[in-house]
Regions:
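Repeated loop/turn-to-beta-strand initiation elements of outer-membrane beta-barrel proteins
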Residues: 19-21, 49-51, 62, 74-81, ...
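Solvent-exposed loop/turn segments connecting transmembrane beta-strands
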Residues: 33-34, 57-64, 83-94, 119-126, ...
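Outer-membrane beta-barrel "beta-signal"
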Residues: 69, 202, 364-370, 375, ...
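Residue-level signature of outer-membrane beta-barrel architecture
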Residues: 71-73, 100-102, 137-139, 207-209, ...
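Transmembrane beta-barrel wall of Gram-negative outer-membrane proteins
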Residues: 94-197, 203
Length: 404
């Protein structure tokens, strides 16, 4: 009996998300007379449908109300259908999605979505509406090749500090702006607006051997995406954006897991185009550098100054990288305790890949997986290990989902 192949098959079934294995899922009984092995796979069925109505609070969205329906077995055919409505103090999300993960009874996924989102956080507001279509193929046991065609129409508005600070952009001074002290408020705040359409196609390759898509204990995930925007596709911006990500989950003991994630990306423009300001990289928050508020890790020079548009809006990076390290303790049932440290940064074009300049955070996290959610509730306390004068030394976050 090929035990490695058998266990791989069991974990692959678990990765579908319809079945949840127990901690010791396999029980073997050997029948020497008949030369047979009876195998019992222990676990329980996972709900296929999610219906949510409620209200809540997260650091990113503020107070919000939501209604959501999602099923991974639409009309009993194994299709995925979802509709989600969420409105809050700082963000709104409206999405409609459908996909067939086994189109024509083959390992082929076909899907489409339409969406409208807006977010008002940190120093910017962004409103996005668009649609996308997906075509994917299974290459091997854990490999997938997919293509995403996307259209996005974006309007954005960025704060500009017009007076009261060193480096006043209204006085013709456009080098990096010195960040204000935390206790000083801008005397006159204006805004700069940007809008544009992005049409893109993104081929991607992924490898995913994790034993559970929502709460993995072992396995790895690798993805390589290459987004082509503009050119013959149209739109207002011409660029290529490769992005790479790798995650690893290693069980250390029966109740502990070491988890590692590294990722990065970079823009390359062509046809004398430019990077849309609303797509430039910004880090911070529970999905990147925990302990620093959402979207506030922007490129800075050696003196801690931001890079600005000619009008005075702060610019994100044309490249980024991040590393996340976790040691997870399962306390019992759906509860996990996590120790973490995060590293990473964003860089402006003139800085290149300055790996000697990076941000560091560390902290603790409590995760609780409830039956009505497919992703864990997270209570995160992070410490900014090298804060700038305009930053807090720590941050508490509440969210739903995972960092990687």
């Amino acid at each position: 009996m090929n035990m490695a192949g058998f266990k791989s098959s069991v974990y692959k079934v678990n990765a579908l998300g319809f079945w949840k294995l127990e901690d010791d899922p396999l029980e073997f009984k050997f029948d020497d007379e008949k030369k047979r092995v009876n195998v019992t796979v222990k676990g329980h069925e996972v709900g296929r449908n999610d219906i949510q109505f409620g209200a809540g609070y997260s650091q990113l969205d503020g107070l919000f109300a939501q209604a959501m329906f999602n099923t991974r077995n639409f009309l009993g055919r194994g299709d995925v259908f979802g509709i989600s409505l969420q409105t809050g103090a700082r963000s709104d999300y409206y999405t409609l999605t459908f996909s067939d993960p086994y189109f024509l009874d083959r390992r082929m996924i076909v899907g489409a979505s339409i969406f409208k989102t807006n977010i008002d956080v940190a120093d910017f507001y962004r409103d996005t509406k668009g649609a996308s279509a997906t075509l994917g193929f299974g290459l091997g046991r854990f490999d997938t090749l997919s293509f995403l065609l996307s259209y996005e129409d974006v309007f954005s508005r960025y704060s500009v500090y017009k007076s009261g600070f060193v480096g006043d952009p209204t006085a013709g001074h456009v080098p990096p702006l010195q960040p204000p002290p935390k206790d000083q408020q801008p005397l006159d705040v204006a805004s700069e607006e940007f809008a544009g359409k992005v049409v893109s196609i993104t081929p991607s390759y992924s490898y995913d051997s994790r034993d559970d898509p929502f709460d993995p204990n072992r396995g790895a995930r690798f993805s390589l995406r290459l987004r082509f925007s503009g050119g013959p596709l149209g739109g207002d911006f011409d660029y290529v954006r490769p992005e790479l990500a790798y995650s690893l989950f290693v069980p250390v003991t029966k109740h502990t897991v070491f988890a590692f994630n590294v990722e990065g990306g970079q823009f390359f423009v062509y046809n004398n185009s430019e990077i849309p300001i609303y797509e430039r990289y910004r880090l911070g928050g529970d999905r990147s550098l925990r302990g620093i508020p959402y979207y506030t890790v922007l490129p800075r020079d050696a003196n801690g100054n931001y890079f600005l548009t000619p009008g005075g809006a702060r610019l994100g990076g044309d490249r980024y990288w991040q590393v996340n390290l976790e040691y997870q303790f399962r306390l019992g049932g759906p509860v996990k305790f996590v120790m973490f440290t995060d590293l990473g940064n964003t860089y402006f074009e003139t800085q290149g890949w300055d790996f000697a300049s990076f941000r560091r955070t560390a902290g603790l996290e409590l995760r609780v997986t409830l039956p009505m959610f497919q992703a864990p509730l997270r209570f995160i306390y992070g410490v900014n290990l090298d804060p700038y004068p305009d930053e807090n030394k720590s941050d508490f976050e509440f969210s739903i989902g995972t960092t990687f």
